[in-house]
Amino acid sequence: MKNRISFIQYFTTFSLIFFLNSEFALSNDISKLFGNWKHREKPVWININPDTDIGKGIIIKNDDDPTSIGKFLFIDLLSDEDRFSGKIYVPQLGRFHPMKAEISDSGNIKVLVKVGFIKRTVYFDKQT
């Protein structure tokens, strides 16, 4: 009986440590996206920030459409090692659509959106 209690305590402690480490790793990976970014082809700037371990990207400047300031461009950003997933707002569809993203070697965000047979890649450059 004593061995069983000891095993349960060990297992509980190990599980707790593993869970805390995985949460810490998740927040570290997603933190690579935090900050201000500019769309490479359009005059749109976003700020990516955490919201309880999930990243969100808010439009902070848009020279073409000032009414979009304060709206979400990215939601539900999660980390999967060196890649990220979430949803991006697609104005043509009027809704959020799943996307994949990664940080390139030059430190920029590469976002891939696939809608049916159509794929589109957009880039965001880090602003300092």
What would you call each of these model-derived segments?
Residues 11-21:
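Bacterial N-terminal signal peptides
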Residues 1, 21-22:
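Alpha-helical architecture
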Residues 100-123:
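Short, exposed beta-strand-loop hairpins at the edges of beta-sheets
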Residues 25-27:
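Boundary at the C-terminal end of the N-terminal hydrophobic targeting segment
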Residues 29-99, 125:
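Central antiparallel beta-sheet cores of small beta-barrel/beta-sandwich binding domains
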Residues 2-12:
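Bacterial N-terminal signal peptides that target proteins for export
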